[in-house]
UniProtKB/Swiss-Prot annotation:
Subunit structure: The glycine cleavage system is composed of four proteins: P, T, L and H. In this organism, the P 'protein' is a heterodimer of two subunits.
Class of this enzyme: oxidoreductase
Reactions catalysed: N(6)-[(R)-lipoyl]-L-lysyl-[glycine-cleavage complex H protein] + glycine + H(+) = N(6)-[(R)-S(8)-aminomethyldihydrolipoyl]-L-lysyl-[glycine-cleavage complex H protein] + CO2
UniProt keyword Oxidoreductase present: yes
Name the UniProt record assigns to this protein: Probable glycine dehydrogenase (decarboxylating) subunit 1
Alphabetical keyword list: Oxidoreductase
Keyword RNA-binding tagged: no
Length: 441
């Protein structure tokens, strides 16, 4: 016996299955072009579970142990232990899609509460129960805009400061529907209204803006952006997140038709993935919403019951009529976000958001006292979580030197770094300021 926990089919089992389907060899079940097939040994030695764990831990120890001040779309907040305790219950962590509502009422109710949280924060009429991440949610918003617009058109306008990775996903995901993605100029970390107005025409189907922006600034001209979009019969899509939305103007109050973003700021640590795409929109677009919706109804006994509804995905209807061709979502991550939000409560969520205004303001003031550093770059703006700082020395060199000191920051251009501070790294701000002083003076 190998000690493996996996029971692979015996030779007799394999022969019986091949005989049942009428073939002689396993190879006959596949049609793989020779140029991409592999017929050889992998060169991987069999290991026990204990040996495999040692190898993985040894490899993980090669990672740099940095205190991150990175941000730019990925923000870590303290996640209470309650979130792990509840979300790792077997009925949650082993559940797949809730196709059998009679046995998944608990999970469905949590997802309904998650949707309700987003509806309350955005002021919009409907929110789905998650998408992959902010980038795919933005791409789905562009496709929705193209579907619902009365007139023809295919142009989508995004601010110049939006991360290249988001724009790449947007372009790639919409490439089959002739959507043209264009950037419009920004001014001092915010929308340049003159540039946006000059870019508008009858072919624009959606205008995208952020609050807070990729630069960390609070966008102060959202109503004007919404008016511009509306005057050209284009949808206004706003990017944000649940923590920031708890203290900012509600998206519906500035004219937003769609809200996208990443809700993994609640319930999840930062990592190489596992985002939580936000998608909320006006109720009139209900049947155009991508992904899944959890609805509340009644069972045969008249008791409130939850179920998946309006699943207009290609998994359920004809592909050409589907609103989305992404066939899964982030239900378990949404569950964690809902648990975290419930733990915070309305007041706690606001307190956390207000702290995210105070922390960057205080840290920027301290860095501004360092010789060779000017912070924040956008000193006439309010910031949430992050800000940009000008460095006399080349920013890439400053970022590399800080990495050697154990801190991670983004170099966003030749002489600008971006710094993010939250409740997860505020304990290290004294050491961070000292490191910046050491590498800058």
């Amino acid at each position: 016996m190998s000690g493996s926990p996996y029971a692979s089919p015996s030779e007799a089992d394999t022969d019986a299955m091949l005989d049942a389907v009428g073939v002689d060899r396993v190879d006959e079940l596949f049609d793989i072009p020779p140029e991409v097939s592999f017929d050889g040994e992998f060169g991987i030695d069999a290991k026990s579970e204990q040996a495999a764990l040692r190898g993985v831990r040894r490899r993980l120890s090669d990672n740099d142990d940095l205190t991150e001040f990175l941000g730019r779309g990925h923000y870590e907040h303290y996640v209470p232990s309650l979130v792990d305790s509840v979300s790792q219950r077997s009925e949650f962590i082993t559940s797949y899609t809730q196709y059998q509502p009679e046995i998944t009422q608990g999970f469905l109710q949590v997802l309904f509460e998650y949707q309700s949280l987003l509806v309350e924060l955005t002021g919009l009429g409907v929110a789905n129960c998650s998408m992959y991440d902010a980038a795919t949610a933005l791409a789905e918003a562009a496709l929705l805009a193209k579907r619902v617009r009365a007139a023809d058109g295919n142009r989508v306008l995004v601010p110049g400061f939006v991360r290249d990775s988001h724009v790449d996903v947007l372009r790639n995901y919409t490439s089959g529907s002739d959507v043209v993605v264009e950037r419009y100029a920004t001014d001092a970390g915010n929308v340049d209204l003159d540039a946006l107005e000059a870019a508008m025409d009858a072919d624009v189907v959606m205008v995208y803006a952020e609050n807070p922006t990729t630069c960390g600034t609070v966008e102060e001209q959202l109503c004007a952006v919404g008016d511009l979009a509306d005057s050209h019969d284009a949808l206004f899509c706003l990017g944000s997140d649940p923590v920031a939305m708890s203290i900012l103007q509600r998206p519906v109050d500035v004219g937003a038709d769609v809200v996208v973003g990443d809700a993994s700021v609640l319930g999840m640590p930062t990592s190489y993935g596992t985002g939580l795409g936000v998608f909320a929109t006006r109720k009139e677009f209900l049947r155009q919403v991508p992904g899944r919706l959890v609805g509340a109804s009644e069972d045969d006994a008249g008791t409130r019951a939850f179920t998946l509804t309006l699943q207009t995905r290609e998994q359920h209807i004809r592909k050409e009529r589907a609103t989305s061709n992404i066939c899964t979502n982030q239900a378990w991550v949404a569950l964690r976000a809902a648990i975290h939000a419930a733990w915070l409560g309305a007041d706690g969520l606001v307190d956390l958001a207000e702290r995210m205004v105070e922390l960057p303001r205080d840290l920027a003031a301290r860095l501004d006292d360092v010789s060779g550093v000017t912070a924040p770059v956008h000193d006439d703006r309010h910031h949430i979580r992050e800000f940009q700082a000008r460095t006399e020395q080349p920013a890439p060199a400053v970022a590399s030197a800080l990495e050697a000191e154990g801190f991670g920051v983004h170099a966003v251009d030749d002489h600008t770094i971006q710094v993010c501070v939250t409740d997860a790294n505020e304990h290290a701000t004294d050491a961070f300021v000292a490191a910046v002083r050491e590498v800058s003076e």
